């Protein structure tokens, strides 16, 4: 009898303690989630893409890098290329770069990349190339083949002054190298850089940032953290829907205001909503840009032109395919 009494008196005490701990744990998790994603970023500006010619007369659609939005630190430019391969065949012949990085993303078709050091490679559908121009690269980007569509993007990212004369470097990734997170029914996120759902993208960045290709079926939703203090935007390339409560449509960049996360919902159309989500920590330094050179002073721009004209822009000892990871 004594043993039975002891069991009966312990059981309620244990149950109350367990329930109290469970409630405290759930409350803590809820508060943590709420505090982590407390401020939805508003859309402060919508930039419509402008059609213009680049390279050997190839038509592109530009949002960042126009008179409407000169730059969004650390981002200098975003172009979308969407043409029949035949119409873009003239491509982008040899041209120089210094002082920044580029990211080329292909959805359809192939671009062949060559530089003055004899390096070459092909970026195919789903592929990504992150190129650190650093102290100097001279290269070409040409369509490979004339069949089908050529559809992709090129993003220019500034480098801080301390890294502008770093050694050039390439990071090439094929479709299978980029993780895809099915974050909710009908929502997929290709994580090129940054983190989504605990999955980290492969691109190594000198300046903290994120780069994602988000695809939402009609009615599907996604939420992505974007750290406080970062600048960012979403570029819609297909379909329609809403991003942070604002209407999203193709060839438009939606500029993110202050906050710590973004949300998006696919529209009712058959294509849902597809967009690039791009955000990064601002560098906060002067941006002096002249064509393919981006430095912090006018004198550095003059020096870049002198180096290019004298054949000293790219150091013969540099091999971007063997970049020094220790510099990252």
Predicted regions and their residues:
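Jelly-roll (double-stranded beta-helix
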Residues: 2-5, 11-328
């Amino acid at each position: 009898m004594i043993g039975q009494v002891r069991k009966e008196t312990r059981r309620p005490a244990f149950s109350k303690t367990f329930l109290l701990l469970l409630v405290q744990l759930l409350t803590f998790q809820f508060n943590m989630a709420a505090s982590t994603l407390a401020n939805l970023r508003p859309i402060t500006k919508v930039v419509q893409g402008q059609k213009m010619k680049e390279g050997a007369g190839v038509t592109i659609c530009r949002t960042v890098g126009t008179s409407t939005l000169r730059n969004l630190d650390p981002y200098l430019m975003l172009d979308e290329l969407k043409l029949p391969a035949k119409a873009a065949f003239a491509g982008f012949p040899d041209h120089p770069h210094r002082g920044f990085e580029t990211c080329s993303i292909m959805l359809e078709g192939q671009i062949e990349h060559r530089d003055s050091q004899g390096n070459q490679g092909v970026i195919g559908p789903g592929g990504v190339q992150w190129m650190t121009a650093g102290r100097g690269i001279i290269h070409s980007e040409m369509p490979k083949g004339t069949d089908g569509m050529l559809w992709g993007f090129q993003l220019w990212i500034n480098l801080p002054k301390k890294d502008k004369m770093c050694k050039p470097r390439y990071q090439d990734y094929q479709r299978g190298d980029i993780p895809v997170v099915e974050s909710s029914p009908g929502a997929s996120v290709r994580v090129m850089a940054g983190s989504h759902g605990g999955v980290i993208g492969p691109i190594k960045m000198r300046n903290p940032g994120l780069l994602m290709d988000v695809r939402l079926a009609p009615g599907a939703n996604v939420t992505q953290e974007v750290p406080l203090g970062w600048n960012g935007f979403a570029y819609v390339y297909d379909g329609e829907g809403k991003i942070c409560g604002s209407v999203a449509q193709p060839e438009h960049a939606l500029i993110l205001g202050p906050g710590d996360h973004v949300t998006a919902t696919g529209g009712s159309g058959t294509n849902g909503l597809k967009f690039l989500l791009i955000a990064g920590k601002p560098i906060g330094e002067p941006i002096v840009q002249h064509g393919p050179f981006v430095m912090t002073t006018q004198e550095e721009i003059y020096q870049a032109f002198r180096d290019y004209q004298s054949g000293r822009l790219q150091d013969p000892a540099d091999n971007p395919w063997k970049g020094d990871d220790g510099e990252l």
